[in-house]
Amino acid sequence: VVSTSPTKLVNVSYNNLTVNLGNELTPTQVKNQPTKVSWDAEPGALYTLVMTDPDAPSRKNPVFREWHHWLIINISGQNVSSGTVLSDYIGSGPPKGTGLHRYVFLVYKQPGSITDTQHGGNRPNFKVMDFANKHHLGNPVAGNFFQAKHED
């Protein structure tokens, strides 16, 4: 997903469930937008938050790599609701028989306000690195991920 892993965590919670570096959560548990998202933000700085699945439709055959599930730009500090939503949240929904998928949250510090409100494509085949390069975001400052598989 990215060439340089972030050194800090983005804290993500779904009610009383916490995303913790690859723990497994069910699609039902993450159906709705997280109830809390926070990171070590600089006051007055602007950030981009993305949630992406690099394993679409499966880890063995990721022909849709990446499928982005959420994209928000121009977040003031860590006040996610202050940002501009480019793609509404969609929870995990791995197809049957595709095994565990990783759902990755990345936070980028922006050099300034992003005025281009096009994310550069559809949800499948999104490339977070291309988006970051286009907007001069550099490496992510925080990240985290969970895993999920199809629910019967």
UniProtKB/Swiss-Prot annotation:
Xref: Gene3D superfamilies: PEBP-like
Disulphide-bonded residues: none
Pfam family, any one: PBP
Domain of life, source organism: Eukaryota
Family statement: Belongs to the phosphatidylethanolamine-binding protein family.
PANTHER family: PHOSPHATIDYLETHANOLAMINE-BINDING PROTEIN, PHOSPHATIDYLETHANOLAMINE-BINDING PROTEIN 4
Protein known as: Protein D1
Gene: D1
